[in-house]
Amino acid sequence: MSTAPAEWPNDAFHVFDTTLRDGAQREGISYSVADKLAVARLLDDYGVGFIEGGWPGAMPKDTEFFAQARSDLKLRNAQLVAFGATRHAGRKVHEDRQVLALLESEAPVVTLVAKSDVRHVERALRTSLEENLAMVGDTVAFLVGEGRRVFVDCEHFFDGYHHDPDYGVRLLMTAAEAGASVGVLRDTNGGMLPSGIARQVA
């Protein structure tokens, strides 16, 4: 498994591939650990910058993939990325098993999915808006403190922006202040047109 370079150029363009996680959710697709290792090697050969390997701790096959990758996957171009969630509401970050599993994967980069639509915070997470921000900030700071580069994946960002424009921005600022390198603005439902995205990010 490769390690992150000391500095990341501001003008660099990177391809972030999600075949091994998001792609594995397609109907009829079921990767074995050996399949995932083989695909990762091919993606590395293509020059992909980041390979999202799966969700360690949540999916046993993904946990095993990262364990085998430590010894069997020698990447020349790509960084392996572990996908996961922030700490649970009301739980200390250093005691949260799903966060610790991200560390145990030994992936140099972690993508954290975070609720950026207030309706999903209240209805799905069933917690307060402030606690959700704390969950993001605590988890990012903890992982960065352990030497990981962190991307924050803002789920339902554009739908949430229509409902409450300020909250998604507050979440991004919280993540950045805690040390996140990248904020991913996700059109989770796929309903945005390019012109609408351009207006919201301008």
Locate predicted features.
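A glycine-rich helix N-cap at a beta->alpha junction
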Residues: 75-83
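N-terminal start-of-chain detector that recognizes signal peptides
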Residues: 4, 53-54, 82-84
